[in-house]
């Protein structure tokens, strides 16, 4: 074990002396030189800051031209300088005891060393953007699922070799050191992982862009698998600190909740009183691949301003009261997606979303003002700023931007609204109704009173647009449009709109009355006596007509209010997705089929109104992390056969593998790489679950968030059917009929999603039974890998041979794990849903195992079920009956089984069509077995999957966002 001893503190050179394993004259010289550079650099890296919108600038931004210190060419690390840097950080930025240099300490010292190099480029990138005053994109997301940073950072910097050599000299392997890093618990699933892939591509392609998120102390949760199924505990990933982040105490902004709105003498609104907290920035440098560009992920944490601490209560012994406000502030960033079943949970989620939006918008505006100098032109704001909302969580940035522009900067509503519409854009990630966020109008009004006023103004703008488009003649049609499109659902119609509707109704009534009078006039007798009588009654009629007119006006008002007024028994809600569509200049889906569903179903009325807003941007994944760094052996093979590693930034070159797909030498190398990766999975499974599996079996994997629409239940039902059939056969028949399989699951069920947690429990119960059945042996194993995260995926994906993407058609927006598996030569079985459609087109129909109903059939199939016309396949009924025998334990699965039965009712009637697709699914699995027996054919299919995955690079996606939505250009550092 490598160790070093502590000595005196008389000078820099004698602060500490390493033991004999580390001492050498050359390394001491390099260490001293490195210290000087580092100290100079550290003074300089604090030279940039931006001020709060709500307060004076905290410190002046220094002119970078006057600074001394690093330029990009000062420090070019090699293994010797890397070694000195690691030693330096082991000594001077200690997180552990000084006596021993063990693996955890080696990791932190190595990470700090890498961060030094990142910050050099990070500073240069920031300063160049400042100097050039470029248009910059800002990506707001509640999640960033980054994974481990060490291997990714040194890979992008081109320093893998020097760091591996340096750590070898210190007695460790780079891989062992990298495994000490905990995954950053800043996300959960595809939404957050996509955001992280996008940041990697933005930096690699030299686009001026930043990410904004929240710094969650405990993440979503750490998943434990026990005899009771899934259990959740806090994920304390920050316990030992995060070496990749830089706390920016010089950058903080006030964030307000509650309070009231006051109108000043000049008509400007002021949001006063309430509860104030402070959002503090933590910066994480994001390096591009083989480029100097290093962009920023700015994360916000929350605290109470010192002046708000109740010192009087504390000194009087009421410590709980004194600390109450601090706890309320801090808990905003404790947990990702806190449970929202309670009012407190809903309030906390809204506070999270608003904190992200408010702090980020204040920061963006401060940067715009700083770069504009003394000539701030707000009409130029959209020419310098693009804000992308990753799903509906950052929706509050719309009213927040309007609030700042109007209430703080003094712009008119018209000008602020135009600027906002040109600035923000919205990515839709779901067609699930429950995921299209709706918030209580009352709760939002209490928490953010000014923002509800602004949202009401946007809603009023929308209503006038709808009236202009559809007119007021057909009130039934108009009511239908408002019900589908309003932002404020079941809320009073604005008076300006109400007056128009009442006037229109009165005009219609007048026209109708005039027609009736004309008809009556034609039928009158022209006799003189009647004329005389009419003259006598004229005065009386005029008085009566006045009264009738008043009644008719009242009737018109009552009619309009009855048709368009709020219903007392319905909740008043704010539709956040509608707010995004109305306010943004672009709305995009994330796969071709999803974007069509968005236009034709989810937002069809808006699409009719503004077809030019709607776009498709099929998702992608970074080939650096998801092929090169996690699967280096396969990457070397690809580089060899394509002639260079250009495919890492130009994935179209992967398509060149197609011409070698039948080459026996390539196939042999390909199978060997896959086999080596499978051995890593064997080790992972043993470590995480205790199960021992055979590397000779097919590795069949489904790893994703546990949800009914993703249909892990269909997968495990297929496994149960397979197991039952095996049990009915002789050993010889089993071996002939079935290919050995290891069926691997991974993913988290939300803590409050009971049915998803039942599915986890069922999978683990099936595994417990099957894995201990001596008759079955290695023919079938079922494994649930606990606490699925990016690092687990980086082991499972390279060694997988079949991956399941089997969601109910039309319900998965895109998916990105399907892209990662395909890129690593894994074959897919799936429905025509999300990105599966496009993957199948690129890899070839014969190289994708397709089954199941299609998206356009789903509504009809559900209707058929509701009418009692669906007849389940006997094999599906056989599986359910087998489960009910108790073969998988004593747990009561009636609630789970019940969701698949009946024709109607909440939580019943097989809404996700497991029973409908089951027979097609198991027959498709037979085709998988047949194909796998021919390993030459299977390997060719695997190669063609990698070759066809070229389209699904996040680089392609980001180019499209930059060109079509953000309108930004690459900016390469000199």
From Swiss-Prot:
Intracellular or extracellular location(s): Plastid, Chloroplast; Plastid, Amyloplast
Region (Disordered) residue spans: 509-551
Cofactor(s), names only, from the UniProt record: pyridoxal 5'-phosphate
Gene Ontology, cellular component aspect: amyloplast; chloroplast; cytoplasm
Keyword Glycoprotein found: no
SUPFAM superfamilies referenced in this protein's UniProt entry, alphabetically: UDP-Glycosyltransferase/glycogen phosphorylase
Enzyme Commission number, as recorded: 2.4.1.1
Composition bias type Acidic residues, residue spans: 517-532
Catalytic activity: [(1->4)-alpha-D-glucosyl](n) + phosphate = [(1->4)-alpha-D-glucosyl](n-1) + alpha-D-glucose 1-phosphate
Record keywords: Allosteric enzyme, Amyloplast, Carbohydrate metabolism, Chloroplast, Glycosyltransferase, Plastid, Pyridoxal phosphate, Transferase, Transit peptide
Top-tier EC class: transferase
Tissue occurrence: Leaves.
Modified residues (N6-(pyridoxal phosphate)lysine): 820
Transit peptide residues according to the UniProt entry: 1-81
CDD domains, alphabetized: GT35_Glycogen_Phosphorylase
Keyword Chloroplast: yes
Function according to Swiss-Prot or TrEMBL: Phosphorylase is an important allosteric enzyme in carbohydrate metabolism. Enzymes from different sources differ in their regulatory mechanisms and in their natural substrates. However, all known phosphorylases share catalytic and structural properties.
Family: Belongs to the glycogen phosphorylase family.
Record protein name field: Alpha-1,4 glucan phosphorylase L-2 isozyme, chloroplastic/amyloplastic
Species of the source: Solanum tuberosum (Potato)
